[in-house]
Amino acid sequence: MRIAILGGTYNPVHVGHMFLAKEIEHFLNVDKILFIPTHKPVHKCVENISVKDRIAMLKLAVQHENNMFIDECDIINGGITYTVDTIACIRNKYVHDDIYLVIGDDLFESFDSWKNPEKIIDSVNLVVVHRIYSERLVSRFKHTYIDNRIFSISSSEIRSRIEQGLPVDYLLPFDVLQYIKSNNLYVKGK
């Protein structure tokens, strides 16, 4: 089986994440896509939103997709989890499968400073997706590049819009938007 893994905070999950998953499914011809929400990201602060809420929103986003699943290995491990540890967890479950680690070019830029990047490369097929750079990044690490220029929206931008009272309709899966509204998430002063 061919499995793509997409890690992130998903704070909140948005249409850019979902469209990217569909692009990965198409271009890599994968059988399964695993969304892996981080418990506590190494380089980000998860502001005032519980892990429970982030998982609930992700479940709503993938509920109608037959080959998209959530793996909570980073949540179960707790604390800060490094990608190399996440991959070891996934490898234990999918020993004989082809695993594709999908990361944005913004993260790929510093890939050589990650914990055990060589071990990551030895364990998975690295896929780099265009996010911010106009040119492809050069690297000593073997990777496949996907030019995904459709959605340049970010979770932080969506949080900011909600905090400012600006519309976010159509930037989020409908059920995720309803969850955010029902639970009063990302509202200024909360």
From Swiss-Prot:
GO terms for molecular function: ATP binding; nicotinate-nucleotide adenylyltransferase activity. Disulfide bonds: none annotated. It catalyses: nicotinate beta-D-ribonucleotide + ATP + H(+) = deamido-NAD(+) + diphosphate. Coiled coil: none annotated. It is an enzyme of class 2 (transferase). GO terms for biological process: NAD biosynthetic process. Pfam families: CTP_transf_like (PF01467). Pathway: Cofactor biosynthesis; NAD(+) biosynthesis; deamido-NAD(+) from nicotinate D-ribonucleotide: step 1/1. Its EC number is 2.7.7.18. Keywords: ATP-binding, NAD, Nucleotide-binding, Nucleotidyltransferase, Pyridine nucleotide biosynthesis, Transferase. Belongs to the NadD family. NCBIfam families: cyt_tran_rel, nicotinate (nicotinamide) nucleotide adenylyltransferase, PRK00071.1-3. PANTHER family: NICOTINATE-NUCLEOTIDE ADENYLYLTRANSFERASE-RELATED, PHOSPHOPANTETHEINE ADENYLYLTRANSFERASE. Catalyzes the reversible adenylation of nicotinate mononucleotide (NaMN) to nicotinic acid adenine dinucleotide (NaAD). This is Probable nicotinate-nucleotide adenylyltransferase. It comes from Borrelia turicatae (strain 91E135).
